[in-house]
């Protein structure tokens, strides 16, 4: 399944900017790897887009943002695979969208 999401906020700067779009792909048979950017359905924070910082012994994901405005890994907690919606496939910078208009 493909997901299209608009970036809201600055927690993934400088990689992803507020207003950018990403397309993510859900993986069924393969796992996600450290440093991949994923979309997660978090029980407390809703849908969040973060980078996998660590995979623990229980195969749960610990996330971090690229920017200083991000929640800490400890605040987000360990994320099980069934909460992952998908991994970044394409990044569409908002500056390109303004050129197209």
Question: Predicted regions span which residues?
Answer:
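Extended hydrophobic leader/signal-anchor segments used for secretion and membrane insertion
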Residues: 1-101
């Amino acid at each position: 399944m493909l997901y299209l999401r608009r970036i809201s906020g600055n927690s993934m700067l400088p990689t992803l900017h507020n207003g950018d779009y990403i397309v993510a792909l859900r993986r069924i048979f393969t796992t996600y790897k450290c440093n991949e950017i994923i979309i997660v359905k978090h029980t407390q924070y809703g849908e969040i887009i973060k980078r996998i910082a660590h995979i623990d012994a229980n195969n749960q994901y610990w996330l971090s943002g690229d920017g200083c405005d991000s929640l800490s890994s400890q605040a987000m907690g360990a994320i099980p695979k069934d909460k992952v919606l998908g991994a970044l496939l394409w990044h569409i910078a908002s500056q390109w969208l303004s050129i197209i208009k």
